[in-house]
Amino acid sequence: MKKAGKFFTVLFISLVMLSFLSCGKKSSEYFKLWNDCDSLKALIEYVEDVTDKKSPNYIPVEDRIVTFDMDGTFIGELYPSYFEYNILEYRVLDDPDYKDRASESELFAANAIRDFVRSGKPLPDHFDMIHARAAAKAYAGMTIPEFDAYVKNFAKRTPNGFEGMTYAESFYKPMLEVFDYLTANNFTFYVVSGSDRFICRALVDSLGIEPNRVIGMDVLLKSDNQGDDEGVNYTYKTTDRLLRTDVLLIKNLKTNKVKNIAQEIGKVPVLSFGNSGGDSAMHNYCLANTKYKSRAFMLIADDDEDDHANREKALKLGQQWKEAGYVVISMRDDFKTIYGENVKKVDFKF
């Protein structure tokens, strides 16, 4: 009887293990919203190679680091501009609780955005920094929870140029499948965006991405009772609150992305995803990884049927990215959908 019991125990364990193995997904099964395309094949081939312990390119779990830009990489940016531009325009020009307090520099930045999206007037040179400094001022004095709530409340709006989704829902659905696939293969991914760190945290919160895996533009934070004291000279009290200030610390673009990755992650990525020249430095840092095989992917916004894209411009960029050694993801040819079948592109309304 004891031998029979042991036999059935072993049989039961074997069947359980077999059931677990049979439930494991094939790589292709993660990608229901992708067409059969070269970019997806490149990603799957890479992941299968570096996760195979028998491969000379095997990467230990702890070093499977991936960096993702946000705007235009896995969330919309053509409605009609970046989320952080749209919310600043609203804050400075339309928010009844703030617009009368906006400074000249904030008004300059917000009006530049409005002129750009409504009439196509080019943004001033170095506008990324003009916007960053204006944004630092526009939200100064807010606590972290207050700013988070402000962003999430604005994100409940329907983005201009679309029907069937809110800003908070405007994720590229095929890219969310990439998140799931990489997570299933024990990669750790970080959001490394040019947008405000706390805006990014608010937008990706619904995806379950932890705040400590989000890197972005930063402003100085200080206690509400700190006054003019430096942080090194002030002791935070249990009754204190952290406030945003109007002091810009860093705009997280280009080589600043590399700097922040080195400082905050402490490891060179093995995979990198982006969509613009602001991501090239991050990609090159990844491809320069001397320890492990690496890949970099660039999305191009070439789908002018489902998104407000400039196809001609996107195709030129695609060629530029290929020449730089990046794998190009075509949103028109590689995706079956962008935002989901129930989302419809419509004309902008101003």
Name each model-derived stretch.
Residues M1-L11:
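Bacterial N-terminal signal peptides that target proteins for export
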Residues F8, L21-M70, L78, V92, ...:
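Non-catalytic pre-domain segments flanking phosphatase-related domains
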Residues V10-S19:
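Bacterial N-terminal signal peptides
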Residues F12, K32, A136:
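Generic anion/oxyanion-binding catalytic loop in active/binding sites
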Residues K25-W34, D38, I44, E48, ...:
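C-terminal cap/substrate-recognition subdomain and adjoining C-terminal extension
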Residues E77, S81-E84, Q226, H283:
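Short, function-defining helix-loop hinge/capping sites that tune catalysis or transport
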Residues Y79-Y82, I87-A168, K173:
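A metal-dependent, Asp-based hydrolase signature
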